[in-house]
Regions:
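Phosphate/diphosphate ligand-binding glycine-rich loop within oxidoreductases
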Residues: 2-121
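Glycine-rich Rossmann-fold phosphate-binding loop(s) that bind the pyrophosphate
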Residues: 12, 133-135, 158
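Conserved dinucleotide-binding and phosphotransfer motif residues
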Residues: 30, 148-149
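Short helix-loop-beta connector
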Residues: 99, 122-129, 150
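N-terminal Rossmann-fold NAD(P) dinucleotide-binding loop
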Residues: 138-139
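Gly/Ala-rich phosphate-binding loop of Rossmann-like dinucleotide-binding domains
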Residues: 142, 146-147
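NAD(P)-binding Rossmann-fold cofactor-contacting core
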Residues: 150-161
């Protein structure tokens, strides 16, 4: 009997996300039985719940993992029991694994970006990069750029809040 994995995406205004289709397609390719749910905290049925309450409910409901997106990538850090060193260095998580009560955080944004930039512009100059945006994903891309060998990184953000 194949184990069924219950996973989801937590965020706001994510009803049109392509993430569920991407994950379901990959699960089929790997022969995994997957159920991927959207947990949009702007949904009227969920809007009163905090991220911590959603995480507790996900644990009770048997979720194996949650992808975390805006605006919870940094908020989620407060709920982790353990995390990778990259989560601590980036200051954000985009993946929460729930093996029982030991809630663990990972950040795959940085490694995905590093792979993509290495594949798409491997010979780009790395002396100076100006990055616009410093939120949860922005921190991950900045981290990846430094790992890639950028010697001077200027980060700016138009969000004044």
């Amino acid at each position: 009997m194949t184990k069924k994995y219950l996973v989801g995406l937590v965020g706001e205004s994510i009803e049109h996300s392509l993430t569920p289709d991407l994950h379901m397609q990959e699960a089929r390719h790997l022969g995994l039985e997957y159920e991927y749910r959207i947990i949009d905290l702007l949904d009227p049925n969920l809007s009163e719940m905090s991220f911590e309450e959603v995480l507790a409910e996900a644990t009770r409901s048997g979720y194996a993992a949650l992808n975390v997106t805006h605006p919870f990538k940094q908020v989620a850090l407060n709920s982790l029991k353990t995390s990778s060193s990259e989560v601590l260095e980036v200051g954000a998580t985009n993946l929460v694994l729930q093996p029982g009560a030991a809630i663990h955080g990972e950040n795959t944004d940085w490694s995905g970006f590093l792979f993509a930039i290495g594949q798409s512009i491997p010979n780009a100059k790395r002396e100076l990069v100006v990055q616009v945006g410093s939120g949860g994903a922005g921190g991950a891309t900045a981290y990846a750029l430094l790992k890639w060998g950028v010697t001077r990184l200027v980060v700016t953000d138009i969000d004044l809040s």
